[in-house]
Structures are given as C-alpha cells and as structure tokens.
UniProtKB/Swiss-Prot annotation:
Subcellular location: Nucleus; Cytoplasm; Endoplasmic reticulum; Cell membrane
Organism from which the protein derives: Mus musculus
Repeat positions for PbH1: 572-594, 595-617, 719-741, 798-819
Tissue note: Expressed in Deiters' cells and various supporting cells in the organ of Corti including inner phalangeal, border, inner and outer pillar cells (at protein level). Weakly expressed in brain and testis. In ear, it is specifically expressed in inner ear. Expressed in Deiters' cells in the organ of Corti at P0 (postnatal day zero) before the onset of hearing, but disappears by day P7. Also expressed in fibrocytes of the spiral ligament and the spiral limbus through to P21, when the cochlea matures.
Name under which the protein is recorded: Cell migration-inducing and hyaluronan-binding protein
GO BP field: hyaluronan catabolic process; hyaluronan metabolic process; positive regulation of cell migration; positive regulation of peptidyl-threonine phosphorylation; positive regulation of protein kinase C activity; positive regulation of protein targeting to membrane; positive regulation of release of sequestered calcium ion into cytosol; sensory perception of sound
PROSITE patterns for this protein: G8 (PS51484), GG_LECTIN (PS52031)
Activity regulation comment: Activity is up-regulated by histamine.
Its biological purpose: Mediates depolymerization of hyaluronic acid (HA) via the cell membrane-associated clathrin-coated pit endocytic pathway. Binds to hyaluronic acid. Hydrolyzes high molecular weight hyaluronic acid to produce an intermediate-sized product, a process that may occur through rapid vesicle endocytosis and recycling without intracytoplasmic accumulation or digestion in lysosomes. Involved in hyaluronan catabolism in the dermis of the skin and arthritic synovium. Positively regulates epithelial-mesenchymal transition (EMT), and hence tumor cell growth, invasion and cancer dissemination.
Gene for this chain: Cemip
Top-level EC class as recorded in UniProt: hydrolase
Catalytic activity, reaction form: Random hydrolysis of (1->4)-linkages between N-acetyl-beta-D-glucosamine and D-glucuronate residues in hyaluronate
Length: 1361
C-alpha cells in the first residue's frame, strides 16, 4: 500500500499538461523524495544478508536503502551517513545488537508527511551475560541517538486509543444479536421467528394456552403461516398446558417436537427447529413437581448466515429459586443436646426471620471467626443442626441461614451473532484498526488485572465506530456514563506496522541481584536512548514491545539530560513522541530525564514494570503528556518508589547497614504518571490501572542524579502546576492521584539509613516564579475523574490546591485534602473543591470472580458488588483532614451506610493525631440517594476506627455555612463528646455521632519542650465534668510534644498533666482574629517561679521578635488588663494554677492560621521545685473556678419545608425536666418541644408525645399522673400498645414522678436498656417498631435531665452488612 503523499504527487503530475508537466516533473520528484525518504535518488540499495558478526558502519556520506531483512552484529551511522528503510510489501526485519546514530548520522522509516505503509521491525538481540563489553553510556541492546544524530520513525496513521461506547458484559451477553427475558406476567407459549439468512428476529408472539383454548387455535394458525426455512424458537413461560388442545400439540409434533405432546402443568420446555426440516430440531423438557427448587429446560443451536458468519440461537424455560442469607443471630445460650439444636427453637426466638428448611448454615464466633456447622437431622419440621469449634460443641456463637425465596418463572431467548467473537462499540472512528491488530480494553473495576487483550477480526457489518474481536470478555467493562460519572473503558491499540522490540529468552536469568527472585521471565529487553545534542528525533506510529531492562537508565524510550527539546532548544519542528504503542515492557514506558519541552501525545503504555510515564531528577519542565493512556503498571526493582513490599524488604544493598524497611512509607509508590516537577502538562490522559497510583506529583527538594545543581533548594515544591485538565484515573490501589511526598536526596548514612530516593515527607506550596515571597498561584485541577480506586480517588496536599468540576465514584475514600499536620506549610493558603460530584456506590457493580478482593452487599439496594477494601470499610466521599478546606457546590450521590459499615458522604481521616481546622467549611451541598443518616460520620470505636482516641479524632469539626448539610445555617458540626466547643444548646445527631453547635472557634497549640510523653487534660470551665484528654501529635522519640485542641473563644480553660508539668512550653494562638481571647489556667507544682514573654514568629522568614513580657500580679482581676508590651499573670498557689489571658494583637488574613506579622506566641519558662509530683489541679480548681455555661452565639434557626432540598430531613426534638431553686422556693420545670412547637408538662408524672416516624407529624400527646403510674399503670400500657409501629415516642417527667414500678417496662418496649434505674428527672426519646434506632436516648439525673437532638425522618432501618 502506497502512502497518501505519493498519491497526491502522482495526481498532480497527471493533471499537469504540456510544457508545464515537463517543467514541474523534476520538482515533483524532489517533493516525493523530501516527503518519502525512500524515494530519494541518492540512496543506494542495500541488502547485507544475515551475518551476526557483520559490524556495519555507515559513514562518509553513504546513503543506503535497506530493501530486505537482515541480521548483523551492529550498526553505526555517523559522519553524514544515512540508512533509509524501503517501503514496500515485503516485511523487513532488521536484527542487530545495537544501532548507534551520531555525528550527522540518520535513520529513517517514513516521514511525517509520508508515513511508512509497509511492515518494518527492528529486533535488538543479545543476552546480558554474553561477556560482551557494554557501551559505557548506552549499555547493551540499544538504539542510541547521540550528538548530531537523527532518528525518524513514522508508521501508519492509526487511532491510538478511544473509549467503549457500549458496555461489555462477561461472556459477551447482550453484545449484538438479540436478547429476550421475561418472568411473571408473560405466561404461555412464546414463539420467535428468525430469519436464517441474517440471524435476526422477524416476529414474535405470546399464546396464553393456560387461559383459553382459542389461544391454541391461534398458535396453530401462526405456526402454519411461517414460511419454510425460517427458524422457530418456541418455549413455555410459567404455565402453558391447561388449555392446550390436541391440534396445537400435534402441530408442534409435526415441526419435530417429541415432548410437546405430553406437556404438563408448569413443565419447563424449550424447542428450536427450522420450519420444514423436523430433523433439525433440538428440544428439552423437564417434569416439574412442587413449588421449591429450580428446574430448567435449555436448548441451543448453531446456524450460519448467507455471508458465512455463524450465530447461535439459545432458549431456556425455567423455574428459578433465588436464595439469600438471613441476618446474623446471636446465640449465646446454647442448650446442650445430643441430637443437635432445633431450628424451631431459633425460629420461635426470631419469628418470621428464619425459613423452615434452610439450604445452608454458617456460624462464627462473636468476634467473627468462622466455625464448623453440620446438619444432623432433617425430617419434616424437625430440622436440627450442630456447631463445632475444635471438635467441641459451640457454647456461644452467631449463626445465619441460607433460605430459598419463592420460585419464579423465567424465559430467556437469545441470538448471539458473534460466536466466539465480540463486537466492540467505540466512541471514535476506528477504520484505521485492521484485522490482526491487537487491542487492550482497560478494567473498569478495582482490579487492574481485569484489562483484557483482543485480536481484531474482519467484519463487513461493522460501522465506522465498531470492530469485531476474537473471544469473549471475562469481565464487565463499562461503556457508558453511570450516575453522572464517565466510566467508559479505554480501548488501546497495541500493534503498529513499525516495531522496535527486544529478542527475549524463555525464562529469567540473573543479570542483576535478586532479579529472578521477583520475575520468572526474561527482563533484559531493548532500549532507545537520546543524548544531549541529537539533531532530530520524531517517533510516531511505532510499536515498542519487550523493551527496557531492570537496570537504571535502560528504558524503552529515554531522553537523557537532553535539555530543551522544543523551539527553546533550537528544534524545529519540536521533538515529539506520538501515536506509540509501548507494551509488555521491563522498565517503564517513557522516561524524561533532565529534558524539557517534549511532546508526548497519543501514547499507549501497557503492562510495564516500574513507573510508566516517568520524569526522573526534578528539573524536567514544560513537557506535555497529551491524550496518553497507561494501564497495568506493575512494580519493578530499580528505585524504592518502584518496589512493592517484598522487593523493599529484600533489596537493601543501597541502604545503610541496620536499615529496617518500612515498605508503605519508603517504597510502594509505583505510578502510571510519575511527575518529579509540577511544571509539566497533563491533558486528556488516563491512568487506568497501577499497583499503587495513577498520577503522583512527587518533589525533589534539590535535583538528584546527574541533574544536581540545576535549581536551588525548594524550587520544585514552589513551582506552579502546569496544565492538569480532563484527566482520569481508575483501577489503582493506593490512589487515582497524589500530590504529596518527596524523595530522599541524600545517600544512605548512619544518620538516615534509608536508600537514596526513598519516599519521604515534602510539602507543595505553589507561588509565582517558585518564590515563596511572591503571591501564591493555585494549582488548578479541572475535570478530573477518579473511580474504582481502592483506597483514594485523590490525596492532595498543599498549598493552594483547587479542584473544579471533578467526578469521583466508587473509591474507598473519594478525596482527602491536606495541608499540614501542625500548620499549613503555606500559611494563608487553602484547599478547595467546587462544582464536583461524588458517588459512593454507583451502578457499576463490577464482576464477581474468584480473584475479586471483596464482594459484598451495596448500601442502597443490598445487591452484590465489588467493594474497595473490606466489607465493613467505611466508604467516604470527602475526608476532612488538616485545613483550611472549602467544599462548595458539590453533589453527593448514593452514599448509604449499612449496619456494620459506616459509609458517609463527609467524614474525617481515621486514626488522626493532627489538627482539625474549625474553618473547614461546606456550602451549597446537595445529596441524592444519600439517607440523611449517611451524610456525615464522626466515627466510633471499632473496626477501622480503632479506639478513636487520637487527638485529631477527638477535635474534628467543620462549618456548615448555609445549613445544606445539617439544616442549621451557620452551624458548626463537631464530635458529640467534644465539650471544648459545645454549649448547652448544642443539638446531638446520634446517627452521625456528632453535634450541631454555634460559636466562635479557634485553636490553641501547646508545645511542651523537653518532654514528649505527657498526657494533657484540658477543661473548659463551664463543663468541668467533661475534660478532653490529648496524647500529643508527635511520636515519643521527639524532643517536644504538641497538643492542638479546637477551643471556643472568650472562654476560660484549665490545663493539667499526668506527670510533672513541663518546665518550658509555648502557646500559639491559631486562627485568632485581632481582639480574640481566651483565659487559661495552667497547673504547676507549688513553689514554681515563672518567666513569661510574648513574641511573634514569622515562619516563612524564620524570624522571631519579642513583643512583651508578663509580670506577676496578686490580683486575679488584673489578668484582664494588658498594655502594649506588658501583660499580667496570676499565680494562684493554693490551687496550683497559673492564669494568663491570651489575646491576639494583630490582624489575620482570611485563611491564615497566624497573623500578618507572624504567629503570636506566649512562652513560659518555669523553675520547678525538686521532686515535684503530678501536675493535675482538677480537684483544687473546681468547683472554685467553674463558670456558668452560657450560649454566646445563639443557635441558628433550623431550615423547614421548601428550604430543604431532600425528602428526608431532621426532626428537632428538645426535652427538659429540671428542678430549680429560688431561695427557699422550689420550681419543677418540664417540656417537650418538636420542631419549635412546645408541649409543656402541667402536672407531676410523665408526658408523652407520639410522632409519625414516616412523616414527622405529631399524632398524639398526653400525660399520665403519678396516681396512674402507681395505681393503674395498665392505662399507660394500653396507650403505648395502641401506638402504631414506626412511631417516635418522646417522654419527659415532671415533679416528683414515680421512678419505680411496673410502668417503667414501657420504656424497655420503646428501646430503653433493660434493668434501667430512674432518678428524679427523666427525658426519653424512644421508638416503637421492630428495631432499635441508634438515636433512642434516655437521660435521667437527680436535678436535670435534658435532651436536645434530631431524629431522621422518615425513620428507616439500616440494612445489615
């Protein structure tokens, strides 16, 4: 096939006339030669034959045209020499150990205007252990393009990759052809008439021969009217025999049926025949008795169209019995019985929940460890089973049963027009994909290993956007947008007509340490390397396979310290790599090393070891990765970041002796796109499966390797992000995208034993010109899609990192935005996401396979699906961490918790020791298919959350600016037991384990020097019985410890320690505005003396200036008085408390943690007496310094009615029962309030308000005097018995009510704990129904019982895991 360029030239020659033709002929020939390098008249034909010892040197201006396949030792092209590959029908294969191009040498196959149309392969051969001296720069088995060298490889123009446009189902079902399925409501004999020439359904009809004999007559008429030669598929659904007369039975027998004559009641029956050819018939018939179990009659037959293409017709007539597991039942009082346990006893204990005759049984210990079970006796209703652990009968365990559902009919008719083949429907025109080409279809599930290869087949019937491929898919590959997220599988082309490949051995051999410990195949492939000063390099339409070596520097394509590769470097046209297929590689795909301005476009990288698209040392900038696809990226041995856990532990030669690997910290980072400098462009790229991460922006504090000194320290951490637009990441383990971490830029040493380039901590803060003293320049991430990533959709740490119009779905955690555990690294910056969508569990349920990590129930419909990590892993949309974070105009869809799986749209980082910024905020949040109970979750002790006792776990908080999350505009949401931010009017949200509060909040950082193992106790003076204990954020090995509580401003606090107070500490005022203050009393031993000063510390400039001193006063009131440069402290030696008033003196930017002048601090040096004891002054501080709890910022009014965006909502419930004393008078006060409507209690006893749990309306209210409670409690029993199920029941006491007696049993019926003991005051939120909601609450105290909380409406029981 000739190039289009040649056709154009020929056409011009034909159209020319006379002298003009003759005059232009030589010019046209010159154009051909320019565009098609093999047409140059200066070329000499060259056919060197096959000689492995022939060392070819093409120089001194020789210009050769390779016309046939050849085998040589090596080829060196230099000194103006040129080698061009002839483009003709013969497949040319050039085998050589290496090709070196330098000093004006050139190698050409095709050109940009005249693509190579034939087939040309370069095969690089040789082993690493052949005792051949490697080139000191290029090594072995290479194409090297050195100074002055030119490499031009231009293959056919073919589409590089596209997307599926229709979903592929496992086994190819529903792909092409015809699919028909029915159940109830489609009774009778179902007939399909199929055109045998085309394999298409011509007509179909249903004949209800159960209902009427006339339907039998119509069936006979219908069959008689079908022309001979047509295919008939006939089957019964449900029942078709009751009014089936002999005429119809005989008509079917005439067609070839042997069983229709004897069709009985509800018998499954399927039949396929060709009209007029009874011998072609296939038939299946089952006599079905009873209503339990499954039965199926299935037939299929293979046919051939007039075009010679095969199609398969199949039919099944079935009775199907679905099964499901019951919930788990606790069985802690197991009777000892020789004959086993009777299931009837369990059914009596759990009425309506266990079937009579289970199909299977499972048992576990109370901790979830599987136990053995055995059915020991079945006879009628006497069904028994036994449970064993280590050969002995179980004493206490959990058990569940597999029960069959009622049977249902099912009829299926399908025509598979692609027998052992599949039609792929694609987005783009794929006419350039030819029969014999190989494609790869990416996984759209969590496992990257669900990527599948297919070979293209001829297909006359395919449209321009379809191809037929051999075989059937094993996995589900999505080809559509699901729940608003584009999850279409990428489809990449792997084969090209120009191939560069390594010749490989059958198995691994050791050419470097440990290589055969990790790989059983040969990994010593070929490689292409471009050095500084090459003349030109343009590769397109090329396939690279079996390339790369597990040696540093030997990669499939490697630009090595080549400098600027675009116009800035004098390259015209600029260097590019495009339309390449790089697959089955042994070390990366493309490496950009110390090179800038390279265009990498339309490249497919598949099945590689180590990072695929790789930037190496840190100074690589202005490179553009446009429309590149990487998938199936596996770990390699080269760098710590390439290695998996096993490699990390075994390969320790590059570490210092004594190094103990920590794989998840030091290694485990292999990524599809590894960006060592943010100033590169990624546009329209897809990271479709890596063992770790899709896109990882990593930071080199200084350049590494041979690039040392190319920028100043910290440059890469401050350079603005290049374009990051319309990229996607899925099927990765750790994350779809990460911006975080750095690499260790020093060699291993006794001080730091980790290997060079291990993963370490780093922070990103983009500024103009990479100068932190210049304005910030946010990193903008637009139109990013992340789905089916097992851990994170994205983990982004900044600096200003802003996301806009992004999509996240089916990730373990959709998004974590982080700044710094102590301070934001770039104070004044924020992380932000807006106009984005988060989906918890989409309609992409994945494929249930043996190798699926996790398969379990979904949250909304409880149907099976693949899950990201574990069945009980708490799936989260956005995870709050550090701050400040702004979430604006985002939609959360399909987040639904199960009992045992705490899924939520908004949540917090698990096991968090670090700070939580009170200025983290949300606004204009929308929820779709998210129960209100699953909007937020603050955590509880248990799996994944552990004890929930780390400092950050206890101080989590965020600001709901418009009430779109909580229904309380302007409120703050906090953990329910964080009394440093609570006030008396806060409203509990039991489902969230949180509370809705109002107030003005900031943070106080307390740094205790020369002591890292102190436990701090901080108490807010208005809630002295609710201290907060903080362990400190830092490890015990540090020289100081830091505590970071969120506090309410304008309040008083005391601070205590579990050991002797620290002799030196600093208190930082964080997120304080000018004039904000708190009063603090710090516990010290008696006899302590103090030196206290204040200063301002500029963290950016690392400058500190003293601003004042504190002098002692003997009057507590003087602590309130302060003057510029002079403040007071009060040392109350009786209580052991040092009192200070901490007040911010300077203005603060909106998102800054510290003031514009720096961080305001108070430093305390204490001279402690010897042998001082524990510094806990709680007993002497309270009640002396207790303050009355008041609400400084009133609670916002709850949104109602049309203000709410969802049908489910919160019902505000307030109840109080208290005793108040005014001098010698006593007043009992009680009320119940529902959504602002108050029901006062008028007499001693109890008052009840009943609320419809479906709509939230009060349906009744009443009171029961003490006389009734004590004398005739049956009135209360009857009242409660008459309350409809699914009702919320509120109850409050007033006065001296009766606290004991039979009436209290109603509390237990409404969800209160058994054996409760009531005190003088009681408030109760109960529920009448078949389950106990988490929000059932009983408060009972001697003086005051109070409940302020919300209840979700409608009340819905969570499904069990």
């Amino acid at each position: 096939m000739r190039a289009s360029g040649r056709h154009d030239v020929s056409l011009k020659i034909v159209l020319a006339t006379g002298c003009l033709l003759l005059a232009n002929f030589s010019g046209a020939s010159s154009a051909v030669a320019t565009e098609c390098p093999d047409q140059s008249p200066e070329l000499q034909p060259w056919s060197p034959g096959h000689n492995r010892d022939y060392q070819v040197h093409i120089g001194h201006g020789r210009k050769l045209l390779l016309t046939s396949s050849a085998t040589v030792h090596s080829i060196t092209i230099s000194g103006g020499g040129k080698l061009v590959i002839k483009d003709h029908h013969e497949h040319i294969v050039l085998r050589t150990r290496y090709i070196l191009i330098d000093d004006g040498g050139e190698l050409h196959a095709g050109s940009a205007l005249c693509p190579f149309e034939g087939n040309f392969s370069i095969v690089l051969y040789g082993r690493a252990d052949e005792n051949i001296l490697p080139d000191p720069y290029y090594g072995l088995k290479y194409i090297g393009v050195d100074k002055g060298g030119t490499l031009e490889l231009h293959g056919q123009k073919k589409l590089s990759w596209t997307f599926l446009n229709k979903t592929l189902h496992p086994g190819g079902m529903q792909e092409g052809g015809y699919f028909f399925e029915r159940s109830w409501g489609h009774r009778g004999v179902i007939v399909h008439v199929i055109d045998a020439k085309l394999g298409t359904v011509v007509h179909s009809d249903r004949f209800d021969t159960y209902r009427s004999k006339k339907e039998s007559e119509r069936l006979v008429q219908y069959l008689n009217a079908v022309p001979d030669g047509r295919i008939l598929s006939v089957a019964v659904n449900d029942e078709g025999s009751r009014n089936l007369d002999d005429t119809a039975r005989k008509a079917m027998t005439k067609l070839g049926s042997k069983h229709f004559l004897h069709l009985g009641f509800r018998h499954p029956w399927s039949f396929i025949t060709v009209k007029g050819n009874p011998s072609s018939s296939v038939e299946d018939h089952i006599e079905y008795h009873g209503h339990k179990g499954s039965a199926a009659a299935r037939v299929f037959k293979l046919f051939q169209t007039e075009h010679g293409e095969h199609f398969n017709v199949s039919s099944s007539s079935e009775w199907v019995q679905d099964v499901e597991w019951t919930e788990w039942f606790d069985h802690d009082k197991v009777p000892q019985s020789k004959g086993g346990e009777k299931i009837s006893d369990l059914r009596a204990a759990y009425p309506g929940k266990i079937c009579n005759r289970p199909i299977d049984i499972q048992a576990t210990t109370m901790d979830g460890v599987a136990l053995s079970t055995e059915v020991v006796y079945k006879n009628g209703q006497d069904y028994r089973f036994a449970c064993y652990t280590r050969g002995r009968a179980c004493r206490s365990y959990r058990v569940r049963f597999l029960c069959g559902k009622p049977v249902r009919p099912k009829l299926t008719v399908s025509i598979d027009t692609n027998v052992n083949s599949t039609i792929l429907s694609l987005v783009d025109n794929v006419r350039s994909w030819r029969p014999g080409d190989t494609l790869v279809v990416a996984s759209t599930d969590y496992s990257m290993y669900q990527a599948e290869e297919f070979r293209v087949l001829p297909c006359k019937a395919c449209t321009s956007t379809q191809v037929k491929v051999a075989g059937k898919p094993q996995y589900l590959h999505i080809g559509e947008e699901i729940d608003g997220v584009d999850m279409r599988a990428e489809v990449g082309l792997l084969t090209r007509n120009i191939v560069v490949m390594g010749e490989m051995e059958d198995r691994c051999y050791p050419y470097t340490n440990h290589i055969c410990d990790f790989f059983d195949f040969d990994t010593f492939g070929g490689h292409i390397k471009f050095a500084l000063g090459f003349k030109a390099a343009h590769l397109e339409g090329v396939e690279l396979k079996y390339m790369g070596q597990q040696l540093v520097g030997q990669y499939p394509i490697h630009f090595h310290l080549a400098g600027d590769l675009d116009e800035q470097g004098g390259y015209d046209p600029p260097t590019y790599i495009r339309d390449l297929s790089i697959h089955h590689t042994f070390s990366r795909c493309i490496t950009v090393h110390g090179s800038n301005g390279l265009l990498i476009k339309d490249v497919v990288g598949y099945n590689s070891l180590g990072h695929c698209f790789f930037t190496e040392d840190g100074p690589e900038e202005r490179n553009t990765f446009d429309h590149c696809l990487g998938l199936l990226v596996k770990s390699g041995t080269l760098l710590p970041s390439d290695r998996d856990s096993r490699m990390c532990k075994v390969i320790t030669e590059d570490s210092y002796p004594g190094y103990i690997p920590k794989p998840r910290q030091d290694c485990n980072a292999v990524s599809t796109f590894w960006m060592a400098n943010p100033n590169n462009n990624l546009i329209n790229c897809a990271a479709a499966g890596s063992e770790e991460t899709g896109f990882w922006f990593i930071f080199h504090h200084v350049p590494t390797g041979p690039s040392v000194g190319m920028y100043s320290p910290g440059y890469s951490e401050h350079i603005p992000l290049g374009k990051f637009y319309n990229n996607r990441a899925h099927s990765n383990y750790r994350a779809g995208m990460i911006i975080d971490n750095g690499v260790k830029t020093t060699e291993a040493s006794a001080k730091d034993k980790r290997p060079f380039l291990s993963i370490i901590s780093a922070r990103y803060s983009p500024h103009q010109d990479a100068d932190p003293l210049k304005p910030r320049e946010p990193a903008i991430i637009r139109h990013f899609t992340a789905y089916k990533n097992q851990d994170h959709g994205a983990w982004l740490r900044g600096g200003d990192v802003w996301l806009d119009s992004c999509r996240f779905a089916d990730n373990g955690i959709g998004l974590t935005l982080a700044s710094g555990g102590t301070f934001p690294y770039d104070d004044g910056s924020k992380q932000e996401i807006k106009n984005s969508l988060f989906v918890g569990e989409s309609g992409n349920v994945g494929t249930e396979m043996m190798d699926n990590r996790i398969w379990g129930p979904g949250g909304l419909d409880h149907s099976g699906r693949t899950l990201p990590i574990g069945q009980n892993f708490p799936i989260r949309g956005i995870q709050f961490y550090d701050g400040p974070i702004n979430i604006q105009n985002c939609t959360f869809r399909k987040f639904a918790a199960l009992e045992g799986r705490h899924t939520s749209a908004l949540a917090f980082r698990l096991n968090n020791a670090w700070q939580s910024c009170p200025h983290n905020n949300v606004t204009n949040i929308a929820f779709e298919d998210v129960p209100i109970t699953s909007r937020v979750f603050f955590g509880e002790p248990g799996p994944w959350f552990n004890q929930l006792d780390m400092d950050g776990d206890k101080t989590s908080v965020f600001h709901d600016l418009d009430g779109s999350v909580s229904e309380y505009p302007g409120s703050y949401l906090t953990k329910d037991d964080n009394w440093l931010v609570r006030h008396p009017d806060c409203i509990n949200v039991p489902d969230w384990r949180g509370a809705i509060c109002s107030g003005r909040y900031a943070q106080m950082y307390i740094q205790a020097y020369k002591s890292s193992n102190l436990r701090m106790k901080i108490i807010k003076n208005d809630f002295p019985s609710h201290p907060l204990y903080l362990e400190g954020a830092l490890t015990r090995s540090t020289h100081y410890q830091q505590y970071q509580p969120v506090i309410t401003l304008q309040k008083g606090y005391t601070i205590h320690w579990d050991q002797t107070a620290p002799a030196e500490l600093a208190i930082w005022l964080i997120n304080f505005n000018k004039g904000d203050w708190i009063r603090v009393g710090l516990c010290y031993p008696r006899g302590t003396t103090f030196s206290i000063l204040s200063d301002v510390h500029n963290r950016l400039l690392k400058q500190t200036s003293k601003t004042g001193t504190f002098v002692r006063t003997l009057q507590m009131d003087k602590v309130e008085q302060s003057y510029p440069g002079r403040s007071h402290y009060y040392w109350d030696e009786d209580s052991g408390l040092l009192f200070l008033k901490l007040k911010a003196q300077n203005e603060r930017e909106k998102f800054a943690f510290c003031s514009m002048k720096g961080c305001e601090r108070i430093k305390i040096k204490a001279l402690l007496p010897r042998n001082a004891g524990i510094s806990d002054c709680t007993a002497t501080a309270y009640p002396r310094f207790t303050e009355r709890a008041i609400v400084d910022v009133p609670m916002p009014r709850k949104l109602f009615g049309a203000q709410l965006k969802t049908k489910d909502h919160f019902l505000e419930v307030k109840m109080e029962s208290s005793r108040q004393h005014f001098f010698h008078l006593r007043n009992d006060f009680a009320y119940i309030e529902v959504d602002g409507r108050r029901y006062p209690c008028s007499e001693d006893g109890i008052q009840i308000v009943v609320i419809d749990g479906s709509r939230g309306h009060v349906v009744s209210h009443g009171s029961f005097r003490n006389a009734i409670l004590q004398g005739i409690p049956w009135q209360l029993f009857n009242y409660v018995a008459a309350i409809p199920d699914n009702s919320i029941v509120l109850m409050a006491s007033k006065g001296r009510y009766i606290t004991r007696g039979p009436w209290t049993r109603v509390l237990e019926k409404l969800g209160a704990d058994k054996g409760l003991k009531l005190k003088e005051k009681m408030a109760f939120v109960g529920f009448k129904g078949s389950f106990r909601p988490i929000w059932v609450t009983l408060e009972t105290e001697d003086h005051k019982a109070k409940i302020f909380q919300v209840v979700p409406i409608p009340v819905v029981r969570k499904k069990k895991l």
